[in-house]
A protein has these predicted regions:
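Alpha-helical bundle segments that constitute or directly flank the non-heme di-iron/ferroxidase center
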Residues: 1-29, 91-115
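Alpha-helical scaffold segments that form or flank carboxylate-/histidine-based iron centers
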Residues: 3-11, 32-50, 89-96, 118-131
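Charged/polar, solvent-exposed surface patches and flexible loops
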Residues: 10, 24, 36, 40, ...
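Amphipathic alpha-helices that form helix-helix packing interfaces
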Residues: 11, 18, 25, 48, ...
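Short, flexible helix-adjacent loops and helix caps
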Residues: 23, 27-34, 57, 61, ...
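Conserved alpha-helical segments that form or flank metal/cofactor-binding pockets of metalloenzymes
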Residues: 36-72, 138-143
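Carboxylate-rich helix-loop segments that flank metal/cofactor sites and access channels
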Residues: 54-104
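Preference for long, well-ordered alpha-helical segments
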Residues: 92, 99-143
């Protein structure tokens, strides 16, 4: 059960940071197709976050979010990077590919380290991994 809780916390944290990053990038996106892709990714991350949150609550876990300073620092860095670039669409895509890649690595490490999990937790973890892979493929078109 402890492995399941750790996995769900990791999923929740990854999707919270994903939502935060997209929220920071969305106002900077000038390309309508990029805006649409970002909104779609945000919606999927939010759905996965809500499911992880629900499963944690079912297990009686007290929840806390990502450190607000970490989120603010990430948001500020993202905005500065985008604004300093001549091609904002490509820069946003690059940052999202990097973020999704970090998320995928963490997801795969967690899956290997934690072994067999409750089917609901395992399914949600796989869903996050597949989402991150799909997000990378989608962002490649904007590079």
């Amino acid at each position: 059960m402890q492995n399941e809780i750790e996995m769900l916390r990791s999923i929740r944290q990854s999707t919270e940071m994903g939502c935060s990053g997209i929220r920071a990038a969305l106002p900077e996106a000038q390309n309508p197709a990029m805006q649409s892709a970002l909104r779609s990714q945000w919606k999927e991350y939010d759905s996965i976050y809500a499911e992880a949150d629900r499963l944690l609550r079912e297990r009686g876990v007290r929840l806390s979010g990502v450190n607000p300073l970490a989120k603010y620092g990430s948001m500020l860095t993202a905005k500065l990077r985008v604004r300093s670039s001549r091609n904002t669409t490509a820069r946003i895509a690059e940052m999202l590919v990097q973020g999704n890649t970090r998320g995928m690595v963490k997801s795969m490490q967690n899956l290997r380290a934690m072994g067999v999990l409750d089917p609901k937790v395992s399914s949600l973890s796989t869903r996050l991994l597949q989402t991150e892979q799909a997000n990378i493929e989608e962002m490649k078109h904007f590079l």
